[in-house]
Amino acid sequence: MSASTVRLRDGRRVRASSAADGRAWLRTGWSRVIFTVGASAAVGIAAGLGTKTAVAALLGVAVIVIVLVRPVIGAYTLVAVVPPVSGLRAGLPVPQLRPGEVLIASIGVLLLLLARPGRTPRWRAFDWFAIGYAVANAGLGAADLLSRSSPITLSEADKLLGPMQFFILYRAVLTTLTTERQRRIALRLLLVPSVPVSLLAILQEMHVPGIPALLANATDTQIFLTNSGVARATGPFAHWQDLGSYLFVVVILGVSLLVNQSWRVAKPRILAGIVVLAGIALITTVSFTPIAGATVGVLVLAMTARPRKRWVVRTAALIVLLSVAFAPVLATRYQEQFTGQPPAKQIPYLPENFNFRITVWTTEFIPVLQEHLATGYGPDDPPNLSFTYTESAYVTLLLRGGLPLLFLYAGLMLTLAFRARDLSDDPDAERRAVAQTLFILIVLAVFMQLTTNYFVNAGFPFMFWVLAGLLGDDRTARPRRLGAVLAATGAQRPAPGDRPPGRQSDLRRGRQ
């Protein structure tokens, strides 16, 4: 975090205490010795397991060294890499772990350990609900498994610890990226990787030779190749719903930056290009839920923008243009959903996938949930289910942790929504755009997750938790420290145009 300078009455400048001050235990002499010995041992053991393992270990040590020297680079890496690769299969390159999990478990944890003791962002209600949600998901699920004497397999462990990786990602971003400039760079890094994701989805939809097979191998799924209906792109994700949820956030964030004129993140044409490309890729998923959600979110942002008429006309024209361009694909999907014959068509006027979900909930999951509302059934699948996918975030939460987990989820979403609403008029354009994006995402997710599992799958949750971290700490935290310095020294605040010299003495003795 950049230092805040103040001017004393005698004209001298000093540096005020900041969140970057203090010693972290990983920067002590003993910690360096421990790290050197541990890194050497890790590389040596990896070398005995094979060349690929040794190279991976060496790269891991190099990344750790870079993060130790420049923690902000580690945070940028998490922001730029984790969301777009969250759908890749496990084993790239660490066995049994996905690339995003490896990055969060290494860089994310390391960033939290590097945080200055006593100077990390203060915990808000959202943080407490979030850690409570992560702990409850793991604790209640493990208790359910132990009560049935069921083993905790790797699959169950992944579900138990999944929310914890989201919390680590959130706190690592919040703790490390503390300045406006850092948050602007992070927003840029969050959007730019969506370009190759969108291009891969479009090329996959066009059946460009080699692309479908490449993505099938990278995600360990054949769903695009084996789908018998209309072609639905999955991109670098295992399912089109995951891709749709990721692009849904990209579109909302990009439009929010545009209407808030956040040109410091990217030029208007670049932002518009990213949004249009993501919109086209979103349509290739042929998933009505994220497409409808993005449409509503963009229109809401346009209605609140200034000048309103110009933005409404622009967004409406773009929506109409994309709808006309992809009308044949959307029409085919519409016919699939609304021309179902009995017994597939149970309730008139509802699409077939809604009818199917209602049937699954009423016949498969509700009988199980009625007996396990207090603590849930657990992360594993109940026996004797003919269809094991819950098809709803709320059903998933009730199944994994019962009403307590659902309550904690509602608490973290509500507290973040209130904070985002309060910051939707923030003077900083980027922070305002993030706040508006989060508020819209939370409101729309209430309805969208009735029939989707966005909050626990790949794509959406990683973008969501990164944006929560980029919302930043309370702005009153730094003025309090600066105010304390001013009160203690009788200093005056620097003029807006003043620039501090390159090196100044610290108020505290012995530090420069």
Specify the residue positions occupied by each region the protein language model found.
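Long extracytoplasmic/lumenal interhelical loops at the membrane interface
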Residues: 215, 330-404, 420-427
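Membrane-interface helix-loop-helix junctions at transmembrane boundaries of multi-pass membrane enzymes
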Residues: 71-73, 113-129, 257-273, 307-312, ...
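Transmembrane alpha-helices of multi-pass inner-membrane enzymes
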Residues: 298, 437-446, 453-498, 502, ...
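Interfacial loop-to-transmembrane-helix boundary motif in multi-pass membrane proteins
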Residues: 75, 122-136, 151, 164, ...
